Amino acid sequence: MMTHLLQAVALGKRRETHHKCPDEAAIMTKTIGLISLPGWDDPAVQEITDISLDPVNVQTVMLAENVAAYTLDGMAGTDEALMKAAAHLAGNGCDLVACVGTSLGWAGQPNTNAARLRGRRIAAKAGVPMIMTGTAIIDMLGLLGARRPALACTYHPTDWKNAWHHYVFNTGLDVTLAQNFRDAGIVGPASLPEALRNPSPELIKKAVVGIAADAPDSDAIVVTGMGARTLNQIQALEAVVGMPVLGADTALYASLALAADLHLVEGCLGQITSYLTPVDISAPKAAETK
């Protein structure tokens, strides 16, 4: 039954952005559904509405602990739960569904191609487009033209770090370094799900600055897991290390913006934001005719 798959459903508490855009009357409000992991206070709903310049509604469901155990095998075995959660959100009017949690998209998969096929199978059964953070990160690296990412795995334990490293490498990218807090000599949360209760911005900065120094030939830094929030310091991080930084959170939001055709606050996701801005090709032509 659905109650065994979902721990909490927040369908009655939709959040809508209050930003206004010049052509808002002509824009249909998008409704995005988020599937979150159990055991933490997911800030994604608030953050999506904060960065979108277009009207957007966000609905959420949280997977139950018995179907999303914090192990790699537990994450890999969530197909049915994700499908039913996505179908539930679609039935309540969501145009698009995203899985908040990097490992939900890649755990148990050898590379991004396999993960993408799995995601498509789940989406087809649910009857709604679905974005997985684990594939969104790879897609956004592609938009940036990055081929040599360093992987800052923050609080993820060694087996998760190694599996993520292999996944990214097997996708065809030249991983320069993968390290978690322990590898970097950083004292921070190291157990799940407790670690999801948001490592401090200072810890995340230490991890990013440290891996940039240890792997100077990198052309981007990827920060996982989802509890390591980068949105509110992404521009500062990029300024310090001198290269693009993709958080699990910012990569997911970038992918959502592309899929839902959302205009975003300028620079809010760091360097990747400029790749998401629609270009009005009619404006120069109109000027030329004057």
Regions found by a protein language model. Give the residues of each.
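N-terminal glycine-rich anion-binding loop in soluble enzyme alpha/beta folds
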Residues: 12-14, 18-84, 165-199
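Hydrophobic structural segments
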Residues: 27-34, 56, 125-146, 207-216, ...
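Periplasmic-binding protein-like
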Residues: 35, 95-101, 150-152, 218-225
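Gly/Ser/Thr-rich loops at beta-strand to alpha-helix junctions
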Residues: 37-42, 101-112, 137, 154-160, ...
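A short, acidic, amphipathic alpha-helical segment used as a generic capping/interface helix at domain edges
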Residues: 81-87, 200-214, 219, 226-232
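Glycine/small-residue-rich loop that forms an oxyanion/phosphate-binding "nest" at active or ligand-binding sites
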Residues: 89, 99, 103-126
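Conserved beta-alpha
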Residues: 121-189
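C-terminal functional extensions of proteins
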Residues: 247-290
